[in-house]
Design a protein with these regions (language model features):
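Structural preference for beta-rich elements and adjacent junctions enriched in aromatics
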Residues: 16-240
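Bacterial Sec-dependent N-terminal signal peptides
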Residues: 1-24
């Protein structure tokens, strides 16, 4: 009995240590030699610069075990952030438009804290490029939505097009890109990303899909699904 307890404790601590190790590993964000202005050209740009994909693969809550294939890659050009998502899942939907409940659709999210003031931004984008962007310290009433003119600054491309559609219960692979200028951080006065270190997390979700799921890049230790947990953000290091 004692031996069995010891073995169980050993493997539990090993798993915890592995998670802790992944949390403590900063992600280097390469500084690109070239840039593009159209979001549809981001995949080719990142291919040319050999920017690797990183998996969004943490299943944090046992009540939601479904794990679609989800990856992201990120780079910057001093005043621009380039993000490329690649997803394969069993069903998709895209009912929300800009400023709407995109998290109920097939959705990828980028939460980032650009300074040490506790304020973070949530860039939530569904599979047709509809964007929800807010800033604040907590969630709900503590957050402020971005004005429409700020949303328009974030250039987007989606492989599934831009037209809304209802639930499709069929295996689907889709891609999404964003070009985020520093002006999109509308509560801050950023001019350059080079050399900066920021806290962030990436998510894949689908609250209204046939297989509800909540994946993250960095693990989250809360009893219930909650992406607004900046204490569990990982580290992004923007290369000079």
């Amino acid at each position: 009995m004692i031996l069995a307890t010891f073995i169980a404790l050993f493997f539990s601590l090993s798993a915890y240590t592995d998670i802790q190790g992944r949390e403590d590993q900063p992600l280097s964000v390469p500084h690109l030699k070239k840039s593009v202005m159209e979001a549809k050209n981001v995949p080719a740009l990142l291919d040319a610069e050999d920017v690797p994909f990183t998996t969004i693969g943490c299943v944090n809550w046992s009540a939601y075990p479904y794990k679609p294939e989800a990856q992201f890659r990120i780079a910057h050009a001093d005043s621009l952030i380039f993000i490329h998502y690649r997803v394969s899942e069993e069903c998709v939907a895209a009912l929300a438009t800009d400023g709407g409940a995109v998290f109920k659709d097939a959705c990828c999210e980028f939460f980032i804290m650009p300074a040490d003031d506790g304020i973070y931004y949530n860039f939530e984008t569904n599979c047709i490029g509809s964007l929800l962007l807010e800033e604040g310290i907590g969630k709900g009433a503590l957050r402020s939505a971005a004005p429409k003119q700020v949303l328009s600054l974030v250039r987007r491309w989606a492989s599934l097009g831009t037209q809304t559609f209802s639930l499709r219960q069929e295996p689907t692979t889709w891609e999404l890109t964003l070009i985020i200028p520093v002006e999109a951080f509308f509560h801050h006065q950023l001019t350059s990303l080079s050399g900066r270190t920021m806290r962030a997390n990436f998510y894949k979700c689908g609250n209204g899909l046939c297989q509800r799921h909540y994946l993250s890049w960095q693990p989250i230790r809360t009893p219930n699904p909650d992406f607004h947990q900046s204490a569990y953000f990982g580290t992004l290091m923007y290369q000079p």
